Amino acid sequence: GKSTLMKLLMSVFNVSSGEIYLDLKDNKKLYIDKNSRKMFAYVPQGNFLLSGTIRDNLLIVSPNATDEEIYSSLKIACADFVDTLPSGLDTMLGERGIGLSEGQVQRLAIARAILTKSPILLLDECTSALDEETEKRLLQNLVNLQNKTCMIITHKKAALSICNKEVCIEDKKIIVKEN
């Protein structure tokens, strides 16, 4: 249900009835369709990286990003461990990120999403492999992002604590609670 909802937002699946739209601040509605996909950056549960360098894996979403933009996204995603690797951004990875821990792969996937500059981040269990301290820093960094909306699927209270709204799916109904 939850991951499917995110895929509906990105128009990966078509709705069988009804409509999907975003309520904007100026009381306008933005209807979601395949043309609105660029508004979303999705970090799926069970992230993956391709074989190649860390730089290649980040630039795949933003080929013209500068090193400054890359390092900024790495810092926000608490992926500054890249600086400690012998070849830094040019460190070679195996398929699916072999050579890195699951938590490091998650943070690189988040950095990649931030690098897209999409206004809405969809994060599906994106902190599941992070230790408590790293998760806390990452979540605070996400709160501090300007002009970004983050939608987080989580089972962890730490992630829920930074959210201003909680959306629950109960008995096939969407319930929105203010936090």
Predicted features along the sequence, with ranges:
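Helix-to-loop junction immediately C-terminal to a conserved catalytic motif
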Residues: M10
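Conserved glycine(s) of the Walker
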Residues: G1
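ABC-family ATPase nucleotide-binding domain "signature/switch" substructure
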Residues: T4, A41, G46, I54-N57, ...
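The conserved phosphate-sensing helix
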Residues: S51
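A position-specific signal in ABC ATPase nucleotide-binding domains
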Residues: F13-N14, I162
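ABC ATPase nucleotide-binding domain helical subdomain, centered on the C-loop/LSGGQ "ABC signature"
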Residues: E19-D26, R55-E95, L139-Q140, N147
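ABC ATPase NBD Q-loop/coupling interface
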Residues: N14, E19-K38
